[in-house]
């Protein structure tokens, strides 16, 4: 994911704020709970904790903010018993690697706490039958369109391409559809899927199908038909996300995939949140997006710091509560994961719109599959490499699709044992 390199040096580059409660701590006990988060979540968590600091009696909460999601992940990968946090707010695909490395600790939730969430959300944070955190917010993308360029929601992928070609010269378009949020791996999966390539396959009962990949011929031919002009790109879909957001906001791209963390930027510029999944090549079908949750994850460092009890209470009292998620999402502006927060009147139409798009075309983000490189490369590297090979380097769309299908099939099979 763009979803965004420090070791100990990263902590120096980060900023932190500790907020004290009014409850006197037990003498001699460790009383500071340390939470690590990225450049968006960190400042917002800090503000919420500053406004109400008594989520866990007798403890202070220190939020350490890193410059990006990638910087946070790198720091956590390098964390030691001395430097690591008690809780880290990270992606669900961190769970398999964190559990295997011994840096994440399992947590048991009461039935009452579990009832606050959709059961499938816990699957995102589970590894080998053990839960490692609580769902905080829903992560997904959706497509919007510029109503000054196109008047209605497209029913098919081909309709978007036709509109682009008819408007390209007169409107000075720089692209037809581009990825403004989530990058060319995570954010662009819905384009892969709309054209026939899903990272993994599901049966009619919602179970993963092993040993099978997407049809390289179907996908490759769709790429040729909709994205190519001979051996060159027709300009509709760029192989990079660079400049996409600025170009869409400037009115030179009619369709854009945006992230649910950035919708306010578009509203501020007057755009309607006409959110929808990327339409497929046939009407009524949609490209599937990753619709996962971010989690507040308990670490094994907490027990070593003597703050495990407090960290667990912060997870349930704040991160998993209606009050906590409502307060947090008023600032973070992502769709909340907790049911009570989802129903709260403070949740915006845009937040609900992303939730609806995820319900219509979301698939779980399975880190065990996507992080595997048994096929020669992991999903995150192989996905953008395909667009570069075909749209920039002019390689054959079907032949490259065959290579990609093989990589993803092997990776899914290899990841089966980590579920």
Segments predicted by a language model, with ranges:
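Conserved N-terminal structural module of periplasmic/extracytoplasmic solute-binding proteins
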Residues: 2, 9-94, 399, 407-419
